[in-house]
């Protein structure tokens, strides 16, 4: 579970590196249930589970002087909807396992004793039956809780920290940062949850991280925290589904510009790296409501990633589409541009208005001819060659890069944003072969 694609992106950016061997440390903090579940669903019996857990903690004690495990306890209100989805998923998986068991038993009955591979096939099928049967055994909450209690009781020389109504990985990272504040180094962290990677990016100190199979060195820089927050925003986490219609992954992460401060404006700059059509059905009232929801999401992400326990006081977080997020960010900027340039329905007049704002010392003697041309085309369909002629009349040139003003053929006006892209009320344009960049 956790934040999709975060680990793969950090590995590609070399912020996270796989090490060849474990690193000896004074302290190691363990997200217990993440480790336990990974093992529990890979074995076929409780005896095997106890044995593997025992061997795992033997290894953990060999790489650290002190071991502390963090255990989830109690429900988390912010995860109510997620909890219901997991219950339903477990029910569906249980039904699938029942069906698989029936099919496996039929497959055994259909084996031929005359087949050279009879024993191997039978052994393979019985192994699958054992694994499915144990999965169904663990699906009973009482069985699972009893085994967890027994396993925790069996741990020797291990401090157990129960986390009531707050995720164990969150509390583990809070305590780890406190340890760093007091001792100058972070304890090693063992967790299979990608949220843990996000949470330990709270500062730029190096950390040693383990999952169930590998050891890593995390070396965050001043942009890593922003990247992790941006991925939470786009890809979601256990509490928030992410912006619908967008996902950062190992193939596209390099297209997103990074900043040191995570806020709406910078996220807007990062996400608007390509052409988008906006949700033009949103009313101004809808926009205000969506804007409020966006503020809630950003407040939550900043609380959560800064290890502020108030993150768990948030109610259910709203669902937001990426087009709605961009619509909110563009709408206010478009209204500002309309007021600044007195934009209306006349494309030539709009170009001239923008020109006058940016060329305060323009040649007044040209104004008569300019106004005549504007007037002559006032009620006519404007084509791109007309706009080109008008631009020449103004004495300005076109450019190969994004400028103050852009015209998309045949006659759609766009305002440039910081030389990054163009926008109007209907869309964001990063590039187009039909676009004229007007260098005012």
From Swiss-Prot:
Q: InterPro entries of this UniProt entry?
A: Poxvirus_G5
Name the family the entry cites: Belongs to the poxviruses G5 family.
Recorded protein name is Protein FPV117
